[in-house]
Amino acid sequence: MKDWTGTGRAYADSYASLCVGTAEALLGAFGTPGKRTLLDVGSGTGMLTAAFADAGWVATGCEPEPTMRDVALREHPEIPVCDGTLPDLPFEDGQFDVVVANFVLNHVADPRASAAELLRVSVDLVSATIWTNSPTWLWREVCERAALIPATGERLPPEKDFERTVDGFARMLDDAGWPRPQVSEITWTWSADATALWASAEGGVGGAGQFYRALDDAGRRSFRAAFEFVCAERSIAGRLPLAHSAAVAVAPRG
């Protein structure tokens, strides 16, 4: 699986603003917050957790990567962030009204066990998202321009893997014991800053960042030149409009 070690600042400056694009759909699915509690599992640098808190939820983050937690606590000091990782969260059964994992189950070694763990600590609703059209397509285009062979990415063993579609996600969650998971697909356009995107590559964020760091000097120069070419070709008013799609799942606890 991807190594996120030390990527907190680079992630906060780049993909955090993309991943929070699910906030509206999730908030709409969760209903009125009242004084209900919410756990954001794999909360990263805290941008989505903060969106939940701003909407009135009593929100808590849970993030295993130390530099992610450091950024979250620095930028959102009013929101508690715990150290914890799937599929063994440090919480009691039914400790939170709502439990959500945003773009987490596509990164874990055992998606079904991890999904079951989300269900365990929820008392009301459980929710998760995955990419159906992910940020990797941009970097594949960069690799093609640079005449570099893109990394294929690590695949899970067949018995652990699942199809990254609405139906495939629903089947996996059903296998994990989620009662009546409702899965829909949303699409939005992320207006990305090219400088921040490049910082994510140099900072080792995700598969593209790890691929870039593994290149020799000549490969890095080719990759950078191809990135600048793609950005110049796709940019509108200095921003990159990049379409992405996600499957959003919500299920009642029982």
Question: What is the meaning of each model-derived region?
Answer:
Residues 108-117:
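A short, conserved alpha-helix within the catalytic core of class I
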Residues 112, 123-193:
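Conserved catalytic/acceptor-binding region of the Class I
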Residues 35-37, 124:
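Nucleotide donor/acceptor-binding cores
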